Amino acid sequence: MDVYQMVTERIIEQLEKGYIPWKKPWANCLDGTFNRISRKPYSLLNQMLLRHEGEYATFKQWHQIGGQVKKGEKAEMIVFWKLQDVEEKSDGDERIVKKVPILRYYNVFHISQVENVLPLEKTEEFDTKPIEKAEEVLNNYIEREKITLFVGASDRAFYRPADDSITLPGITQFESAEEFYSTAFHECGHSTLKAYRCDREADNAKAYFGNEDYSKEELVAEMTSASILHSLGIETPDTFINSAAYIQSWLKVLKNDKRFIVSAAGKAEKVVKYILNVE
């Protein structure tokens, strides 16, 4: 039994045990301009409206966590769209209700305008060190293919086909190095869809987030990652379970048909050999 068949069978066996929750393997990075309570970044428009980077919240939100807006401080404005029901008359006097976006706003205060609240730590960091053999595989692939790699404080990991680039959170955002490389090789898997690599561009021509084609590509990328970790001997119970959970989440779109895992594994075998530069 080869490594691809072994990984495929183990993942199917794991899925048959029932629901597995997926865990994002990296710690959040609080950067830019974001809401203190939700910890979510503001939209690009609101980031342009706000004068400072860092934490903002409404008067009420600061009060809820024990903060007190300093006397005389002026609020800044953020905007959002709210759908509102509007009645319209049709030709036959029938009333039609349409949802119309209405621009609304909130007043918010920056943390520098608030007393009794300490700023959040920007990023939770771990003392995570690179794994030499995994680092070598990753760097060899990136350099050989002339892919642009961005590694640093981030809340996202993604491959961007338009400029052939991969963005990854920093390794110290991961509790284990194995999880970092699992994420890195997943994005490397996506990068092989280019016609001059493993040519899955036609398969993904109509892919958009959440549809069948997108889900199939996610299966290929995650099977690639799981297979590379296994072949390098750096797979851990956590990375394997999380890979199975990730595959399970996308398999739902494909009506839980496990045949798609076998199909993805076949494509992943080609991808792994391409990344590792072996026949």
Describe the function of each predicted region.
Residues 1-279:
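N-terminal accessory/interface modules of nucleic-acid-binding and processing proteins
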